[in-house]
Amino acid sequence: MKQKELWINQIKGLCICLVVIYHSVITFYPHLTTFQHPLSEVLSKCWIYFNLYLAPFRMPVFFFISGYLIRRYIDSVPWGNCLDKRIWNIFWVLALWGVVQWLALSALNQWLAPERDLSNASNAAYADSTGEFLHGMITASTSLWYLYALIVYFVVCKIFSRLALPLFALFVLLSVAVNFVPTPWWGMNSVIRNLPYYSLGAWFGATIMTCVKEVPLRRHLLMASLLTVLAVGAWLFTISLLLSLVSIVVIMKLFYQYEQRFGMRSTSLLNVIGSNTIAIYTTHRILVEIFSLTLLAQMNAARWSPQVELTLLLVYPFVSLFICTVAGLLVRKLSQRAFSDLLFSPPSLPAAVSYSR
């Protein structure tokens, strides 16, 4: 990767770390029922609320960058040359790891928590039958909904690229509306909610990126401050879109300025993580399930001392992040060396439609 692109990869690395922390928190802290240390319940609630407050910053910049990086395919690459890399590649990973997660999480729950009632779980990974699993995947009710979204977003943005401005306005309205009139499927709600950020990157990303690089924020400090106040006010009324748009610009500006001032190395931790986001994204959910099912049984039975309990509640998301990151990188390395990266890169489509590398 060229040096000038490293800061973008660093942002991708940060985003996937926040995603891992998000899943680590929601699968653990809300399900605790027993607290021994007087600060344990407070600390658990702090993690839950901290996770909630990160929502406007976690996925929007991730999707903006995803859209920005494929704008060439939107503008100038024929459909036939897009099928392999932009659709088939992602569909393969979505389908393969959707099945892997389903089999793994079903087995883990039968083994570690056979008494757990999953009848009302709306995640394809907890499906009782093949039909339920397929329904969950089709409606984006899966922990892998990000991959589902990438396929849908690309197709929509490429087909309607000549109607970018009016459609972007429509996507903004849909993103706001889904907060008040959601669909029956939580994953589809997330897909609709994040559509403006991807389309913004795909259609207008080049212009925005130029502004991020060339326009100093201090020259427009008053306007930026007023916009931030307005964004926070809207967020308090459950409309996070404006705050997310502001966060995209601020996060990119900070990382770009950091690279310009201090430089970035391709071997830095965030860059390595950013280069392997799909591997970490697809594998971490299985590990998080193992951690939560194992620890919840011990914590709710009060089998550890109050001091151990409090320490675990304090550091668990960071420990989970570390293990999931290392595991994801190892699985990617194994995939490359033992399976020609088949776990994350599909067999090529027939030559007639394959993307020319």
Curated annotation (Swiss-Prot):
Localization: Cell inner membrane
Transmembrane segments: 13-33, 50-70, 87-107, 136-156, 163-183, 197-217, 232-252, 311-331
UniProt keyword Metal-binding, yes or no: no
GO CC term, one of those recorded: plasma membrane
Membrane topology (Periplasmic): 34-49, 108-135, 184-196, 253-310
InterPro entries cross-referenced by the UniProt entry: Acyl_transf_3_dom
Superkingdom as given in the UniProt entry: Bacteria
GO terms, molecular function: O-acetyltransferase activity
Membrane topology: Multi-pass membrane protein
Keyword Cell inner membrane on entry: yes
Entry keywords, A to Z: Cell inner membrane, Cell membrane, Membrane, Transmembrane, Transmembrane helix
Alphabetical list of Pfam families matching this protein: Acyl_transf_3
Cytoplasmic side: 1-12, 71-86, 157-162, 218-231, 332-357
GO biological process assignments: enterobacterial common antigen biosynthetic process
PANTHER family: INNER MEMBRANE PROTEIN YCFT (PTHR40074:SF4), O-ACETYLTRANSFERASE WECH (PTHR40074)
Family, as annotated: Belongs to the acyltransferase 3 family.
Protein name: Inner membrane protein YcfT
Species of the source: Escherichia coli (strain K12)
